[in-house]
Amino acid sequence: DSANFDEYMKAIGIGFAMRQIGSVTKPTLIISAEGDHVTLKTTSTFKNMEWNFTLGEEFDETTADERKTKSTFTVDGDKLVQVQRWEGKETTISRAVSGDSMVATCSIGDVVCA
């Protein structure tokens, strides 16, 4: 469960209905890498998505809530850090594996969800 997730979704512009879906969706994330090339797959009862990208290189991403963003992934220690930019906004999503689960911290402006 993520503290402050609804506030984060509001801050990035997600409407009420999508926030309700987002608050109960528990996606499975699979990350695989070969050198700097990474494949990230999410599966859930709501939507399945896949992104292929090279670390440090910006690419066009369509998010699960249909935002069109410019995204860049980098590695910072044991974290996979994603920066999304769209319509003058910017959000950072930091993902770290702890045991058999992933901990994600999302931020936009002064709104932080962990």
UniProtKB/Swiss-Prot annotation:
One of its GO terms (molecular function) is lipid binding. InterPro entries: Calycin, Fatty_acid-bd, ILBP, Lipocln_cytosolic_FA-bd_dom. Keywords: Cytoplasm, Lipid-binding, Transport. The keyword Transport applies. It holds the Pfam family Lipocalin. It is found in: Cytoplasm. The N-terminus is blocked. The keyword Transport applies. Forms a beta-barrel structure that accommodates hydrophobic ligands in its interior. Belongs to the calycin superfamily. Fatty-acid binding protein (FABP) family. FABPs are thought to play a role in the intracellular transport of long-chain fatty acids and their acyl-CoA esters. This is Fatty acid-binding protein, liver. It comes from Lethenteron camtschaticum. The lineage of its organism: Eukaryota, Metazoa, Chordata, Craniata, Vertebrata.
